A protein has these predicted regions:
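Detector for repetitive beta-architecture
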Residues: 3-5, 17-19, 36-38, 48
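Functionally constrained cores in energy, signaling, and assembly domains
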Residues: 8, 15-16, 50, 74
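Extracellular beta-sheet-rich ligand-binding/adhesion modules
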Residues: 1, 9-29
Length: 97
């Protein structure tokens, strides 16, 4: 709980974070002063992250990526507008149903 960054590591082999649900992110994420959860996942091309859709709680990959600290991130949102997850673009990422 109270996590805002997960570092899967770079150059340390294949690490996977699979089937993340909205509840998983709500349970582990740290809320900011506005009550929003902004989770950042770092890693490299050997790593994999997937989000799991549930009834009424679907993930969406945003069309535009964002750049912070010279790193580019894919941005995922869910039906809960207070949640945003940024996944470093080198990581293999996607949504499962």
């Amino acid at each position: 709980k109270d996590i805002n960054t997960i570092d899967l590591g770079a150059g340390n082999g294949k690490n996977e974070l699979l089937n993340l649900t909205l509840q998983d992110v709500l349970d582990m994420g740290k809320k900011d002063g506005s009550g929003n959860i902004n989770l950042t996942i770092l890693g490299d091309s050997q790593d994999k992250v997937s989000f799991k859709d549930e009834i009424g709680k679907t993930w969406e990959k945003q069309a535009n990526s964002v750049t912070e600290n010279n790193k580019t991130f894919d941005v995922y949102t869910n039906s809960d507008s207070t949640v945003q997850v940024k996944v470093e673009d080198k990581i293999s990422d996607g949504i499962t149903s």
